[in-house]
Amino acid sequence: MGRVGVLLLNLGGPERLEDVGPFLYNLFADPEIIRLPFPWLQKPLAWLISSLRTRKSQENYKQIGGGSPLRRITEEQATALRQSLSDRGQAAQVYIGMRYWHPFTEEAIAQIKADGIDRLVILPLYPQFSISTSGSSFRLLQRLRDRDPEFQKIDCSVVPSWYERSGYLQAMAELIAQELDKLEQPEQGHVFFSAHGVPVSYVEEAGDPYQREIEDCTRKIMETLGRSNPWTLAYQSRVGPVEWLQPYTEDALEELAERGVKDLVVVPISFVSEHIETLEEIDIEYREIAEEAGIERFLRVPALNTHPLFIQDLSDLVEQTLEQPRFRLEDVTLLPKKVKLYPQERWEWGITLNAEVWNGRIAMLGFLALLVELLTGRGPLHALGLL
């Protein structure tokens, strides 16, 4: 079999307040996060957005101690996974590849090559697949592989998503049950799943399976839980004026309060590690919205982190992937495109010289408008609460 490695993929997060700006730049410079018709606009726009959002984001990170715990927790998960595999007699090095902050995926691949790894299991720490999370990391890995003959020699097997696995479902159900049982009337607690949202266009135009997998995942968790509690699925972290998957978490919380719900158990279903979206967005922002709306008891299910059932299930998954590889990197980076975003019969987009001239003018006007808003502190983005 040769030397075995496991590459855990995750988002990454700023560990210090001074890291926030560069982290946001890396995030918004990813074309899978912000899709633009002109690649040359990506980096200038990323610089602009990150410059505008850094101060507000730093305030949020101050609320959770001045930095993200994501790297530390992911390292703990990697250590636990390596030990679990070792206990089974499977020697494997476990690496961490973050998409937008250290240790970057590129750093992990360099170490994997230096260690002489022959077989690599690529395992995203996102239970459900989305083109903006696992998909972005897979595409980065494919680009690195395409231009690196040494990387091409490594036998890579990929796990696109794994939300259906029984160990994961059991671990989630166990954590939910523990929070429900803290209530005076556990059977009355409303289970509230909050998933990270994505723009509707990702699902309807790009064919992203994320919404389907999230909805299927919530049903399977409730089936595994085996209780009759009412439950709701909503989507958080919406950014910008475009339509995202609904219902939005803040709206759903207020609606439940209007319906008389008093006991709420919130489940961060997209995340397996504590980070800014659980510790600040859910624990602080959404808690405040819920309590102001009339919800009296707001309990939040902890992220899986190094839950024994979760780590055991990841170990099972690695062993099964080594025994029966199902997907290559190339298999998970070619997503079908369902419709054209800019139909040619309605609008010339980059086909003729005249179209290119108008496209350039429109893009430049938009960029200048953003710069004016940055300098004046007034404009539609401020009105929408984005800046």
Curated annotation (Swiss-Prot):
GO terms for molecular function: ferrochelatase activity; metal ion binding. Fe cation binds at H196, E277. Keywords: Cytoplasm, Heme biosynthesis, Iron, Lyase, Metal-binding, Porphyrin biosynthesis. Its EC number is 4.98.1.1. Pathway: Porphyrin-containing compound metabolism; protoheme biosynthesis; protoheme from protoporphyrin-IX: step 1/1. SUPFAM superfamilies: Chelatase (SSF53800), Chlorophyll a-b binding protein (SSF103511). GO terms for biological process: heme biosynthetic process. Signal peptide: none annotated. This is Ferrochelatase. It comes from Synechococcus elongatus (strain ATCC 33912 / PCC 7942 / FACHB-805). The gene is hemH.
